[in-house]
Amino acid sequence: MTLTDFYKAVNKLSKMFNWSGNSIQDEPRRNQVVVCQPLMLPFAKLPGVRRINKATVRRSVRHGLAKLGIGSPILVTTVPNACDYIGDFGESKVIYYCVDDFSEWPGLEKMMVKKMEEELIEKSDRLIATSHKLFDKLSRSEKPTYLLTHGVDTEFFQQSIAREHALLDGIPRPRAGYYGLFDERSDHDLLAQLAQRMPDVSFVITGRVESGALSRKRLPNVYFTGSVPYTELPAMVNGWDVLILPYVISDLTDAISPLKLKEYLATGKSIVSSPIPEVLKMKEYVFLAKTAEEWEKSLRSCLDRPENGKQKPGADFWANETWEKKAKQFLDDVQD
């Protein structure tokens, strides 16, 4: 177990014993989202852990459903280990909403996750994938399978902001920015190289950063603002000159569909990204770069000659990418 794994386990255990998260309100309001957080043990590979988790989840969720007066629910899951709970809640339909290839995640038992997912697919009535790679994988089954890419709140990210975020005060321009979780999927080494090759550019990371070369090297032109509330993202992006998506090229990132890609596009700013499959499908809007040399060239082009930027998506594109449209498609797929 690495130090990072240890801290993750401690965080998981602390959440487990937050008993307030397991309660259900006595009088929930109509259309309210109710969160039920059952006690779950980590380390599913250990003998008996899956049985214990199944018992606690089943008891907690059944209690919540009864309290809310819900019978024959539609069960929607995004994780393979839900295979252990199918059939326990009297569900009328099971939907596997696949958002990642979890078998490729570092630290997870690959074969165990694959087996869980195979079992979940077998028990599901509908399969929904958020990327083309995941759709191709799920389509090998005989179950009805649908592609549903992420949506975007275009009005929110296209809004006019008078000033930049206060956390950017004192950070020199030009600025290349990234927001969101910077973890194993992100290329720490690449960004560290870019910071060293381009000392005149400030690289700003807004969000939680998992341990990696980028945080260890303490480079003078790399700035970590920490996380900010979602409502403050437009003000943060307003102070950046170019937006970046530096991903590691791997089996894991082959399957992801970055939520922030369309959010970045909605801002109208230039974007430089690693050439992962879902980004390649929008290459007319994004500068693609793989090596540090290609990244530096693309960033220089965006910063020095912004008038030569990529074309911007039109109204027809955005009309089909709203969360309202995606929600309707989801309901159509589920009820088909």
Briefly describe each language-model feature range.
Residues 186, 231-236, 243-266, 272-284:
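Nucleotide-sugar-dependent
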Residues 133, 148-154, 160:
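Carbohydrate-associated surface elements
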Residues 124-145:
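A short, active-site helix/loop in glycosyltransferases that binds the activated sugar's phosphate group
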Residues 168-186, 191-195, 203-206, 319:
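Conserved donor-binding/catalytic core segment of Leloir-type glycosyltransferases
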Residues 212-235:
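Nucleotide-activated donor-binding/catalytic signature segment of Leloir-type glycosyltransferases, i.e.
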Residues 306-334:
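A charged, aromatic-enriched C-terminal amphipathic alpha-helix characteristic of glycosyltransferases
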Residues 59-66, 70, 109-127:
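Membrane-proximal helix-turn-helix segments that form the acceptor-binding/catalytic region
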